[in-house]
């Protein structure tokens, strides 16, 4: 059961644009198909270069075994905290688009199936929401090492006033 922390030029990283948007979002990223490191880097760059995203900072990458269905490659996970001018529904649509852009099929073969890219919205400001397609904060974030480890490392590496 391998667990490992990876760092590179983009993970962890703090990037600030001159614009400072008001909506604060916490994301969990995961990938275990094709080239997970390349996919996570490309996802980070997509958010970084988006005109509606201001500050963005990422955790180190946490490599960990899958849960649920375990006969699959290890997951590469990271967290990203960003500021955006997009409202919740527009941001949710952007996440949906990015997942598809990176090859994620909307229909999974089965629960906990391998995937090229999974983006979970862990939190959006202080919104509490329970709908069929979205629950905030993410209902299982506090039970998953794939979120807790990167998020904890992120908090250690960056002072709150930096973001």
From Swiss-Prot:
It holds the Pfam family HPPK. GO terms for molecular function: 2-amino-4-hydroxy-6-hydroxymethyldihydropteridine diphosphokinase activity; ATP binding; kinase activity. Its EC number is 2.7.6.3. The keyword Transferase applies. InterPro entries: Hppk, Hppk_sf. One of its GO terms (biological process) is folic acid biosynthetic process. Gene3D superfamilies: 7,8-Dihydro-6-hydroxymethylpterin-pyrophosphokinase HPPK (3.30.70.560). CDD domains: HPPK (cd00483). Keywords: ATP-binding, Folate biosynthesis, Kinase, Nucleotide-binding, Transferase. It catalyses: 6-hydroxymethyl-7,8-dihydropterin + ATP = (7,8-dihydropterin-6-yl)methyl diphosphate + AMP + H(+). It is an enzyme of class 2 (transferase). Pathway: Cofactor biosynthesis; tetrahydrofolate biosynthesis; 2-amino-4-hydroxy-6-hydroxymethyl-7,8-dihydropteridine diphosphate from 7,8-dihydroneopterin triphosphate: step 4/4. Catalyzes the transfer of pyrophosphate from adenosine triphosphate (ATP) to 6-hydroxymethyl-7,8-dihydropterin, an enzymatic step in folate biosynthesis pathway. Belongs to the HPPK family. This is 2-amino-4-hydroxy-6-hydroxymethyldihydropteridine pyrophosphokinase. It comes from Helicobacter pylori (strain J99 / ATCC 700824). The lineage of its organism: Bacteria, Pseudomonadati, Campylobacterota, Epsilonproteobacteria, Campylobacterales. The gene is folK.
């Amino acid at each position: 059961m391998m667990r490992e922390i990876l760092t590179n030029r983009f993970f962890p990283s703090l990037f600030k644009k001159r614009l400072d948007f008001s909506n604060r979002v916490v994301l969990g990223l995961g990938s275990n198909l094709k080239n997970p490191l390349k996919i996570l880097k490309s996802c980070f760059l997509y958010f970084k270069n988006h005109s509606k995203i201001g500050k963005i900072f990422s955790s180190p990458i946490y490599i960990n075994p899958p849960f649920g269905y375990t006969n699959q490659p290890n997951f590469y996970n990271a967290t990203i905290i960003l500021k955006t001018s997009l409202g919740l529904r527009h941001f949710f649509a952007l996440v949906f688009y990015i997942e598809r852009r990176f090859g994620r099929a909307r229909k999974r073969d089965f629960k906990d199936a391998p995937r090229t890219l999974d983006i979970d919205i862990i939190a959006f400001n202080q919104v509490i929401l329970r709908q069929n397609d979205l629950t905030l904060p993410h209902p299982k974030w506090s039970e998953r090492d794939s979120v807790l480890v990167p998020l904890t490392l992120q908090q250690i590496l960056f002072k709150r006033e930096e973001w």
